[in-house]
């Protein structure tokens, strides 16, 4: 994809919802393309945002969080929209939440400097990608979820071979019986918390 231009970015088939056979155009030329939601010119599924509703929702949710002394990190994986990430951050969000290191990289390229990965990061390629992002972007803060000692050992094993890798910031994920992820029992959570605290990774 071309280098970003925040004032008049180039849009093209690499973006969700852009006609795959159409030539790239600048945002300023988008309206001249004559595409309509009703004439099947745009691929589905497609989300359409009303500016007034978006502005209202951003204000409302940020106010809701602030009144409760909460930091908000809205989930970016659904939209994968750098423009929306910036709007959320400008409205006061602490950071943006992603599900994968790939999604995080898109956010970082768009200027996100605080993020959560709401997932367990443990594969060598993902750990290497995260370490590279942290090394290349001074001040970047990212935390990911850990829900087992086994995952922690995988992270430690990778880091033992990567002496220059930064120490990772993690959050202990609590789960519920029958849930998909997270530590299920109090004793297990305490044991994992102690292991995380003692870990060099």
Regions found by a protein language model. Name each.
Residues 1-132:
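A charged N-terminal "starter" segment
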């Amino acid at each position: 994809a071309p280098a970003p231009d925040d004032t008049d970015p180039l849009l093209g088939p690499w973006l969700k919802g852009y006609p795959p056979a159409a030539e790239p155009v600048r945002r300023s030329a988008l309206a001249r393309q004559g595409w309509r939601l009703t004439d099947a010119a745009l691929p589905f599924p497609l989300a359409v945002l009303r500016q007034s509703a978006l502005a209202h929702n951003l204000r409302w949710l940020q106010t809701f969080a602030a009144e409760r002394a909460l930091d908000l990190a809205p989930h970016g994986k659904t939209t994968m929209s750098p423009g929306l990430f910036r709007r959320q951050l400008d409205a006061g969000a602490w950071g943006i939440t992603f599900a994968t290191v790939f999604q995080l990289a898109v956010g970082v390229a768009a200027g996100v400097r605080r993020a959560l990965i709401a997932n367990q990061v443990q594969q060598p390629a993902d750990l290497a990608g995260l370490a590279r992002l942290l090394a290349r972007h001074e001040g970047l803060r990212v935390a990911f979820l850990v829900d087992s000692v086994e995952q922690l050992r995988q992270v430690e094993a990778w880091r033992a071979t990567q002496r220059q890798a930064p120490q990772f910031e993690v959050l202990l994920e609590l789960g519920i019986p029958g849930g998909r992820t997270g530590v299920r029992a109090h004793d297990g959570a305490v044991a994992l918390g102690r292991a995380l605290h003692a870990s060099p990774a």
